Amino acid sequence: MKYAENYLRSAAVIITAYNGDTPFAGYLKTHFAANKKFGSKDRRFISQICFSYFRTGNSMVGIDMELALKAALYLCNNEPGVWADLFDEHWLKNWHLAVHQRIDFVKNHLAYFNPTQLFPFVSFLSKTIEVDKFCESYLIQPDLFIRVRPGRLPNVIKALANAGIEYKAISESCFALPNGTKLEGVGELDKDYVVQDYSSQQT
């Protein structure tokens, strides 16, 4: 992706300046409102980097911010996708589908990465919870699902393509989109499609 490095630097600046006084989502919205240079696509990609970082809890403490952001993208995505240009061949060849393998890879390549801090409050968990699986779950972003209205499939495909939104067709009427996808202005919500989780679409 052409502007991947720029998005990474912007995310680093935003997170470094954030002091935690307000919820990050509101802080990010205010930041973008004050910086009109960011278009909708810019905001979406920068937001993805930021929220991937926060999914890693306290595990990145002591690591250079831009390197931590790259590691967060690696941990939170099953494949490089649009972020491939940020990584060297060694990381790309070791982009495992299994989250625990990605965690092990980062642990072996970033000295200060501490996977036990993905969820810093392990001591408060019930003894019946599998700690490793629970921590891994924080790195897994559920898809956003839409149900296409009858006869509206061409409209939806065209609208998604025009907006540059990647999707997976689960069926002719069910599409899976990246978590956090903004659908404002993408086709006609309710007329072309509705947002509905996958399990509900099966009933």
Regions found by a protein language model. Give the residues of each.
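Class I Rossmann-like S-adenosyl-L-methionine
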Residues: 1-184, 188
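Conserved SAM-binding loop and adjacent beta-strand
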Residues: 187-202
